[in-house]
UniProtKB/Swiss-Prot annotation:
InterPro entries: Clp1 (IPR028606), Clp1/Grc3 (IPR045116), Clp1_C (IPR010655), Clp1_C_sf (IPR038238), Clp1_N (IPR032324), Clp1_N_sf (IPR038239), CLP1_P (IPR032319), P-loop_NTPase (IPR027417)
GO biological-process terms attached to the record: mRNA 3'-end processing; tRNA splicing, via endonucleolytic cleavage and ligation
A GO CC term assigned to this protein in UniProt: mRNA cleavage factor complex
Binding-site positions, ATP: E55, K94, D156, S157, G158, K159, S160, S161
Function: Required for endonucleolytic cleavage during polyadenylation-dependent pre-mRNA 3'-end formation.
Organism per entry: Dictyostelium discoideum (Social amoeba)
Protein name: Protein CLP1 homolog
Compartment(s) where it occurs, according to its Swiss-Prot or TrEMBL record: Nucleus
PANTHER family from the UniProt entry: CLEAVAGE/POLYADENYLATION FACTOR IA SUBUNIT CLP1P, POLYRIBONUCLEOTIDE 5'-HYDROXYL-KINASE CLP1
Pfam families reported in the protein's UniProt record: Clp1 (PF06807), CLP1_N (PF16573), CLP1_P (PF16575)
Protein family according to the UniProt entry: Belongs to the Clp1 family. Clp1 subfamily.
């Protein structure tokens, strides 16, 4: 996916890597005894036999390392086929391996594996078949867009899992759908605090996750929508405009369409934001995960407004795990760590020292503000949520994440996507220098840096 401002921000030249503003800290390194106990656990594995349409569910902590291997039959993980006898390393993840044919899988015991017999995978596959049929039906109709899918539902209802499955099946069929991530609390494409989009040309990598093309991202700067909902809505409009241009850029893009994942805030203001995004992204298929009321509300809303939108309801898998706040925080920590250090610590981030005079730091909304949910009933913030305010470097910016804007001038910051991210390691007020960590060496693409409430601790 390219545009005039594209640059590979996986290492900036690349962007793939509860509450905004809280420090994210690494766990301490395990002791030698703990490492030995962990190694002993890794060496212990079992072989699980799955019958037709069963799935093997697993869950492993962030400080554990395990693996699994398909030794007989065929199986897939989030729509991606497993290779026979290939060892897949697992750490800090939860998932499931599904089989249409029956299979045998060897897996380490620290993955806490168990077999689930009831799975909605046949229903998920049925939805993909509908998408495929729709794509085929518009092959010779250049004015029609392919599937524009928005997946909605409460937290921990399986939205991300379904997104991966539909994207993987699409890529396996030769399509190149856009994956649109509208959940700033998760950061599936880049890092938390962003909304982004990327073309998906291959199924997800089982070890490394989604492997999209060069992403386009807007920096929201927070992990919760209620910190600045007006900014979030405005950035979504910007991203939707980009999506329209991308789908018009080639026939394969038009036919492939997009799959959009959303956050789990589905009531009150969160529901209104969902409806706005359905409209601005011009969705033609809404998938509601595991919530009767949300399905009823959306169906009622669009039955009076737009009968061209199809709305379906799907159950969540029994393998969908409830993610406690600690797990969510660790997941966000890990996404930022992977951006700078690589999936398996295979990247070497670079320290760069910047003079105060060489950068301009901007904060949206005119400065920190209380979340909308924290304001007294009937009142609203007096701060313009879309105001761009330049701020002087200060010590409280240490451990913050800066986004590097592509804007050529300050007035264009709001409408510009970002080139990558920096971690603020130190600020020296006497020498007027900022020490940052960058995923790549060399000069910054722009002097304009964006600041939100996102923080991270390097060690």
């Amino acid at each position: 996916m390219s545009n005039d401002n594209s640059v590979n921000i996986n290492n900036f030249s690349s962007m793939n890597g509860g509450g905004g503003g809280s420090d994210i800290q690494f766990p301490l390194k395990p002791s030698q005894q703990q490492q030995q106990q962990q190694q002993n656990s890794i060496n212990q594995s079992t072989i699980r036999t799955l019958e037709i349409t069963q799935e093997l569910r697993y869950e492993i902590d962030f400080d554990q390392n395990g693996w699994m291997k398909l030794i007989e039959g065929t199986a897939e993980c989030f729509g991606t086929e497993l290779s026979l006898n290939k060892v897949y390393k697992l750490s800090g993840t939860k998932g499931a391996v599904f089989t249409w044919t029956g299979c045998k899988i060897e897996i380490t015991n620290n993955c806490q594996p168990y077999i689930g017999e009831k799975t909605p995978m046949p229903q998920y596959a049925g939805v993909y078949q509908e998408l495929d049929a729709f794509r085929v039906s518009i092959l010779d109709e250049p004015k029609k867009s392919g599937p524009r899918v928005i997946i909605v539902g409460p937290t921990d209802s399986g939205k991300s899992s379904l997104s991966k499955i539909l994207l993987a099946y699409s890529a396996r069929s030769g399509y190149q759908p856009l994956f649109v991530d509208l959940d700033p609390g998760q950061g599936s494409i880049t890092i938390p605090g962003t909304i982004s989009a990327a073309h998906i040309q291959n199924p997800l990598d089982i070890e490394e996750g989604l492997a999209g093309g060069i992403p386009l991202a807007h920096f929201y700067g927070h992990t919760s929508l209620d910190v600045n909902p007006d900014l979030f809505k405005a950035l979504c409009k910007n991203l939707a405009s980009f999506i329209d241009k991308q789908l018009d850029s080639s026939n394969i893009s038009r036919i492939s369409g997009f799959i959009a994942n959303t956050c789990g805030w589905i009531d009150g203001l969160g529901y209104k934001i969902l409806l706005q995004n359905i409209d601005v992204f011009k969705a033609n298929l809404i998938i509601v995960m595991d919530n009767e009321k949300l399905y009823s509300d959306i169906s009622s809303h669009y039955s009076q407004k737009d009968n061209s939108i199809k709305i379906i309801k799907l159950p969540k898998s029994g393998g969908v795990f409830i993610r406690p706040p600690v797990f969510r925080k660790k997941t966000r920590m890990n996404r930022i760590k992977e951006y700078f250090n690589g999936i398996n610590d295979n990247l070497s981030p670079h320290y760069i020292v910047l003079d105060f005079k060489d950068v301009s730091i901007y904060r949206t909304g005119g400065g920190p503000a209380a979340p909308a949910s924290a304001l007294p009933i009937g009142t609203s913030s007096q701060i313009d949520p879309l105001q761009i305010t330049e701020v002087y470097p200060s010590l409280d910016m240490c451990h913050s994440i800066f986004a590097i804007s592509y804007a050529k001038q300050a007035s264009n910051i709001f409408h510009s996507n970002v080139a990558g991210f920096l971690y603020v390691s130190d600020i020296d007020m006497e020498t007027k220098k900022i020490t940052v960590i960058s995923p790549a060496p060399g000069p910054l693409p722009s002097r304009f840096l964006l600041l939100g409430t996102l923080k991270w601790m390097e060690n």
